[in-house]
C-alpha cells in the first residue's frame, strides 16, 4: 500500500513538472491521473489498491461523527430534563473482532461517545465491559454498537 501511495505522489509531481504549471489545481489533476494509473496497475503492484483503505477509514470517521452527534443529543436530553429519569448501568459487550488494535480502536470510539465508558477488556479479548449513562435494554445497546461502530472497524481491518 505504501508503494502505491508513494508512486501516486511521484506521478503527480512528474505531471506538474511536465506541464510546467505549478498550481494546486494541476497537482490535484496529476494526483487524480496518478490514481488512475495506480489503479490500472494495481494487479501487478503489491497489496490491494490503497484508495479502498482510505475510503474505509473515511467511512469510519463519518460513522463515528454521526454516532458522536447522536450521543451528544441523547446526553443533552438527559441533562436538560427537570427530573432525571435515566437508568445508568453496566453491561458486557461480546465482540467478534480478532486483532488487538481493532479491539482498542472500538473501545476508544465507545469511550469517546458521550454517555458511555469502557471499563476494561477481558483477558481473552472477547468481552468489553461498558458503563452507559442511560441503559434502556442490553439488546439495544449491543445492537447499536455492533451495527455501527464494530461493523466499520471490522471493515477497516479487512485486507
UniProtKB/Swiss-Prot annotation:
The chain crosses the membrane at residues 1-21, 27-47, 49-69, 101-121. Signal peptide: none annotated. It is found in: Cell membrane. One of its GO terms (cellular component) is plasma membrane. It comes from the Bacteria. The keyword Nucleus does not apply. One of its GO terms (molecular function) is antiporter activity. It is a multi-pass membrane protein. Its main location: membrane. GO terms for biological process: proton transmembrane transport; sodium ion transport. It holds the Pfam family MNHE. Keywords: Antiport, Cell membrane, Hydrogen ion transport, Ion transport, Membrane, Sodium, Sodium transport, Transmembrane, Transmembrane helix, Transport. PANTHER family: NA(+)/H(+) ANTIPORTER SUBUNIT E1, NA(+)_H(+) ANTIPORTER SUBUNIT E1. Mnh complex is a Na(+)/H(+) antiporter involved in Na(+) excretion. Belongs to the CPA3 antiporters (TC 2.A.63) subunit E family. May form a heterooligomeric complex that consists of seven subunits: mnhA1, mnhB1, mnhC1, mnhD1, mnhE1, mnhF1 and mnhG1. This is Na(+)/H(+) antiporter subunit E1. It comes from Staphylococcus haemolyticus (strain JCSC1435).
